Amino acid sequence: MDTLNFKYVFLGQSILRYQVPLEIFHIINSIYENKYPELKPANKQLVGKIEKEHSLFFNGEDSDKMIKHNYLPTNVLMWFESMFRHYLKFNRIKGYKLHFNSVWVNQMFEHEYNPVHVHQGTIYTGLSSVMILKLPESFGVEYSAAAAPQNGRLQMLGATNGQFANVDYQPNITERDFYIFPYDMRHCVYPFNGPGWRRTLAANMDVDYDPIRNRGVS
């Protein structure tokens, strides 16, 4: 078995998990905490059943839901772009144009949740993300099946199906995790119970590309 010569071929969408540099992590948390009274509520354009949803960056079309603004320094914006470019390079996507659309923070308390949803920006093709900024000490009591905890979990639901396919992903999240995935990948966050809060960030990057040109690229 050690001498097998094989090549791994993956058909489907990918999720990449990164670790946020401490400097970026602390800057984002500090901006959220210190600028909180100034931050614009993002609830009108989000599906989450969450009271505290606030925007740090928006570069889409002005509307009654949101207008352009930015609370993030250049080095943080550049870091986000570099991560999205890495995802596209890893997935061998060529000939694309980027437009950084939005960044917001969800601070969830017990019983709040994010139902199954997808993302979009100015266009329908692009990459979204989840960054773990703060976690409570515990997600509370699991009232059944404690060996398979669900409280507070992030769940990604892939579009791939068929025999032997991995159809969902539910990571053991830790602070400084950063997950990048396509706009149309369904995902959700389950509620938790007990004290504390769960603070996460989402960032949307529009990716204008030709799927025909990129078909079968290797």
Segments from the language model and where they lie:
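Catalytic core of non-heme Fe(II) oxygenases with the double-stranded beta-helix
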Residues: 106-180, 188, 196-197, 211-215
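Short beta-strand segments enriched in hydrophobic/aromatic residues
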Residues: 133, 185, 205-207
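A short coil-to-beta-strand element that immediately follows conserved catalytic motifs
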Residues: 93-103
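Non-heme Fe(II)/2-oxoglutarate
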Residues: 1-94, 111-114
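A short alpha/beta connector and helix-capping loop motif
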Residues: 195-205
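Double-stranded beta-helix
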Residues: 204-218
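Residues at beta-strand starts and edge strands
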Residues: 12-14, 99-101, 125-127, 197-199
